Structures are given as C-alpha cells and as structure tokens.
C-alpha cells in the first residue's frame, strides 16, 4: 500500500535542535493555514496543523524537520501537503533516532498520516519504516486532535520492534555477492528495467565515508539508501551518454523508495536469519 499523499518538489528545513514557529512559518506556511480549502465540504473538520503540533509538543514530541510541497496554483499554497518529522524527548540524540513522520494537507488530498521512521546522524539519512510496521491515518472529521495524539503513542509503541529489527540487521554479515544482489534489487525499485539503470549495483553499494565500510546488512542498506536519495553518481544513460543520477527531491518518491528499501532489507534479514 502506498501513501495516499503525492508530493512533488518541496521546500524543507532540518535542524539539530527544535524547530521554532518562525522557521515553520518561513518554510511550511501551510502548517498555519487559517481555514480549509474552499473545495472542502461542511463535514470537513478543520484544525490548523500547528494546533496539532502544539498538542504533540505538550506530549513531548518536537519537530526537527519540516517540508511543504510546491504548487503551481498559488491559491493552494496555504493548503498544500506538508510533512514533519518529530522526536520524543529523551530520544533526541544518538547514532540512530526514532522519529514520527506526520503528513497532512488542507486541500482534501491527504488525511493525517503518521508513520514510524529513523534518522541516522552519520549520513543524515531519514529512513521510513516499511508497511509491515503499520501507519496511522486520521480523517478530517470528529476528534482529530485526540486521534492524532493517540496515533502518535501507537507509533511510539512500534519503535521497540523497529529497534529490534535494526539491531538484528547489524549482526548479519553480507558477502560481496549478497551486497551486489541488494544493490541490484534497489536499482530495480527506482528504474524497474535493468537495461535502463544508469549506474551499476557496485556503484550503489559504494560507501561515501569510512564509517560505512562495514559489510553488515544495516550498513549496506544505509549506503544504498544514501546513494539513491542523494544521487550524483556518474553513469551512462540508455542512449550511452554520460550522465549523473538525480537526487530524489519529491517527498512521494522519497517515501516510496525508503519504504521499498526497508522491505528489501527485511527480506534479506529473514533470508539470512
């Protein structure tokens, strides 16, 4: 199952401290939207996302990343889709930090959605957990605030399972052939046709820093994720011209690739266990 929301290119901000309201207003003004879009019916319960964020803050959840999709219709800018990544007090620093991913819009294109994720500091990778860990959806009706708060705690309860799987992956060694297979599977997720991939599996599994030279499943996955999301790898197009892989700048694409890579990693974990 894919996310209902579809995002294009976006404005974003990430800090290694709590984001302020001024920063949110500058980069994600739709969080402060004063009303629903005119296309929404009377049954649509409108609550500004900032109200939800403030209630989550009261519960100890703080935003560290925020982004908003760009729209061609300026009349929809105040209602456009946005995403925030929040951390719980007491789980702010570390090599890998659990995050709650909150998505919403006020133009009818998205319900509130909450998905478990992980932020990895060494490479600033923002991971998204696969569907097998679950995600929470809250429609724009009824007690939205209460349901979102409840959903945040449900996602929080998933993190123990996420951490257990992550630690298990760190203990699984992959030989060169297995790493090549992981890279090949990842390329198929993005390009679908092996004949159209501009780079090789060897390139996609190559580390960008010495900390990522380990051969365990977790680190292999991180190398692949960073190379795919950030792009910049030299390769050849289907027509044989020199090219560079593009960074994935759309949130929908980021979510899709991240979820698919998590599924691949889970399959390798089960296969090697």
Residue ranges: model-predicted function:
Residues 1-47, 54, 58, 70, ...:
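Intrinsically disordered, low-complexity regulatory segments
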Residues 1-9, 90-97, 102-273:
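Intrinsically disordered, low-complexity regions enriched in serine/threonine
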Residues 46-112:
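Amphipathic, interaction-prone secondary-structure segments
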